[in-house]
Amino acid sequence: MAQAVDASKNLPSDPRNREVVFPAGRDPQWGNLETPVNASPLVKWFINNLPAYRPGLTPFRRGLEVGMAHGYFLFGPFAKLGPLRDAANANLAGLLGAIGLVVLFTLSLSLYANSNPPKALASVTVPNPPDAFQSKEGWNNFASAFLIGGIGGAVVAYFLTSNFALIQGLVG
């Protein structure tokens, strides 16, 4: 097996000898690498359409979208996998747990905002990072909207889970 790999080094036409990882922009001084994953058009499209990098959004709108997603998906593990999962009020415990974690995340974001974070650097995946996170005010707007969105997302998940039988009866 090792013989075949060694022999392929002598054949420039062998596909195993093609370089697939390059320095970003072909400049090794950048300290970033272009790989088949992070330089693919699909990954670039996906990353650049996330709320953190989507162009034209205010920091408040970014925080609201990110918070809603986090609040919504944090509810489930607390409600269905937590220590009160078999209790009658498991959904309420899940709601309170998700809200508590969103509050802790918001405090962490506020602390980070007040620590003078460095400016976002351009990378292979995100060539034009948004300027929404260049100031304390932008980060604090993001954090306050994250709190509102996170609590809202957890409440929506709570109502959907608590009223599942009613929703199922309405739909069919």
UniProtKB/Swiss-Prot annotation:
This is Photosystem I reaction center subunit XI. Belongs to the PsaL family. Pfam families: PsaL. It is found in: Cellular thylakoid membrane. Keywords: Membrane, Photosynthesis, Photosystem I, Thylakoid, Transmembrane, Transmembrane helix. The chain crosses the membrane at residues 92-112, 147-167. One of its GO terms (biological process) is photosynthesis. The lineage of its organism: Bacteria, Bacillati, Cyanobacteriota, Cyanophyceae, Nostocales. It is a multi-pass membrane protein. One of its GO terms (cellular component) is photosystem I reaction center. Disulfide bonds: none annotated. Its main location: membrane. The keyword Membrane applies. Residues 1-24 are annotated as: Disordered.
